[in-house]
Amino acid sequence: MSLSNNLSKILIIDFGSQFTQLIARRVRELGVFSEIVSHKKIKIAQITKDNIAGIILSGGPLNVYENDKFKFDKKILKLGIPILGICFGHQILSKLLGGKVKKSKHREFGLATINKVSNSTLTKNFFNKNNRSDVWMSHADQVSKMPKNFKIIASTKNSKLTIIENIKENFYGVQFHPEVTHTNKGKILLRNFVFLICKIKKNWSSKDQKLKLINEIKDQVGDNKVICGLSGGVDSSVVAQLLSKAIGKNLTCIFVNNGLLRKNEEIQVVNTFKKKLKINLIYVNAEKEFIRKLTNVSDPEKKRKIIGNLFIKIFERYANRIKNVKFLAQGTLYPDLIESKSVTGSQTSKIKSHHNVGGLPKRMKLKLVEPLKFLFKDEVRKLGLELNLSNDIISRHPFPGPGLAIRMPGIITNEKIKILKEADFYFIKALREHGLYDKIWQAYAALLPVKTVGVMGDNRTYEHICLLRAITSEDGMTADFFDFPKGFMQSISNQIINNIRGINRVVYDVTSKPPSTIELE
């Protein structure tokens, strides 16, 4: 595997962490180019001080005792390049340099407070006035003995060697995840590593990102025709605009109404893209086809794979009609990939199949074009601004490709779809009316697979439970529930129950991610 260009960069060696791309994204936010490569594929000949300013070793699901499952050339440690190990990266760096790692007596998952022990360039402005900082932990092993010439920078109650460093060799290890937003000043720590320790200068911007993606599309596609699966959301809209700039008239967008869209969504999408943006768009009404295939299916993985397969069949059907179409473009994002599979070939744990990743058929006639697959939602929104997309497209809440199918656990019926469309409509409408929509990362209504007893007008009811979910997030990797102002939940609960037949109870989901995912299925 060759590194992509001659820009001085931060190299991230991936050991399978769910957060690896988040590290790269944090470095890009600093205005510095970064690149990820699997620990299985990196070769020492590719790394020189001329093209690599610093190396970050990611976390991962392995442990350092599984020597047969990870590869790392120890010669990399002798190149004189600054190295930062994060979580598993911290442990493997310590072990390779002669330290010891063992299972923790007390595992640490979630928020933890670390205490400053010594000063360090790495932790400049990282601790508060009480010499503490809140960080996000996710580990069952810990470094129990430091390598020679290392010193302790910070500790927790359960982990003495939480931050360690060898300033002479420029080796640094942190047991927590500075890349996630829950680590209070994680961005400061990464900034210190990039600029104060690696001494690299800014060399990257969103404009560079746009031009890079357009050129990559041209290189991949050439003069061939491409169809783009358009949903009307920000992801597929940005992909469509990138393709339009890269290949012009060789692009045809296809919008499939799978019967699982939000209320009036198909009308809004067609009006926006066909009439306003003048994009070559084909509208396909496949409601009956999707609902028939999903009849009596309750398993969420099967739902996603049925939907993914059917989307591809429809795209291939229309590709044959257009003729000479070789590629299918879609708005896959990095969080989709890391919940479905490993991107770099490292041992990432699968969370669930996304319809456009793990849900795709193994034998596809069309080749995939996924220009956004290494980006996060907010990065895509910035890219949308660079592409001059309107704010109503850029600010839309995420909506999953399988649509309402994964917002009604259990068997899908036309009656449930109708009820859920109305509940979601009232919820989103209320958010807009109260000026809350743009303060929330994603909000939706779901229908739970149980009914409960209620009383309406002195009569007994036995109807569905509507679950409302609204979360705040920066990138979709971690999320917290939105704390609504007093009175809002009571108001929307009354609206839903009074206006929609079939619901007699409304609940609000206050679970964060992790442990939950944003969608129910």
UniProtKB/Swiss-Prot annotation:
It is an enzyme of class 6 (ligase). Pathway: Purine metabolism; GMP biosynthesis; GMP from XMP (L-Gln route): step 1/1. The active site is at 87 (nucleophile), 177, 179. GO terms for molecular function: ATP binding; GMP synthase activity. It catalyses: XMP + L-glutamine + ATP + H2O = GMP + L-glutamate + AMP + diphosphate + 2 H(+). Gene3D superfamilies: 3.30.300.10, 3.40.50.880, HUPs (3.40.50.620). GO terms for cellular component: cytosol. ATP binds at residues 231-237. Residues 9-203 form the Glutamine amidotransferase type-1 domain. Homodimer. Catalyzes the synthesis of GMP from XMP. This is GMP synthase [glutamine-hydrolyzing]. It comes from Pelagibacter ubique (strain HTCC1062). The gene is guaA.
